[in-house]
Amino acid sequence: MFLLYEYDIFWAFLLISSAIPVLAFLISGVLSPIRKGPEKLSSYESGIEPIGDAWLQFRIRYYMFALVFVVFDVETVFLYPWAMSFDVLGVSAFIEAFIFVLILILGLVYAWRKGALEWS
């Protein structure tokens, strides 16, 4: 049986990590000066006067690489706690993690065969 008080540190961490960005946005919105002008609407080019239009269309390849990266980054986030408590969880958790990794590998092979990882 799970004891809920063991998860108090998790909920405290979740609450604090959610509150910090919200507070940062609220404080910056209240304390920052509001100045309107053409400089605010122009793109920033490291202090150099911008040349041409700043609106560029990115190739869809960037999107595909980013999507594959996010999938495997999330996989790492899920597997790290499992790896830290592997000795406690036992064989059933190993089988579940193996199935999880197998599904992700199948997704990678599918993306590879469809040409999602090809640059040209």
Curated annotation (Swiss-Prot):
Which InterPro entries does the protein's record reference? NAD(P)H_OxRDtase_bac/plastid (IPR023043), NADH_UbQ/plastoQ_OxRdtase_su3 (IPR000440), NDAH_ubi_oxred_su3_sf (IPR038430)
Q: Which family does it belong to?
A: Belongs to the complex I subunit 3 family.
Q: Which reaction does it catalyse?
A: a plastoquinone + NADH + (n+1) H(+)(in) = a plastoquinol + NAD(+) + n H(+)(out); a plastoquinone + NADPH + (n+1) H(+)(in) = a plastoquinol + NADP(+) + n H(+)(out)
The record's Gene3D superfamilies line, in alphabetical order, gives: NADH:ubiquinone/plastoquinone oxidoreductase, chain 3
UniProt keyword Nuclease, yes or no: no
Gene name as annotated: ndhC
The protein's UniProt keywords, in alphabetical order, are: Chloroplast, Membrane, NAD, NADP, Plastid, Plastoquinone, Quinone, Thylakoid, Translocase, Transmembrane, Transmembrane helix, Transport
User: What does the record give as the function of this protein?
Assistant: NDH shuttles electrons from NAD(P)H:plastoquinone, via FMN and iron-sulfur (Fe-S) centers, to quinones in the photosynthetic chain and possibly in a chloroplast respiratory chain. The immediate electron acceptor for the enzyme in this species is believed to be plastoquinone. Couples the redox reaction to proton translocation, and thus conserves the redox energy in a proton gradient.
Task: Tell where it localizes.
Answer: Plastid, Chloroplast thylakoid membrane
State which residue ranges cross the membrane: 9-29, 64-84, 88-108
Descriptive protein name: NAD(P)H-quinone oxidoreductase subunit 3, chloroplastic
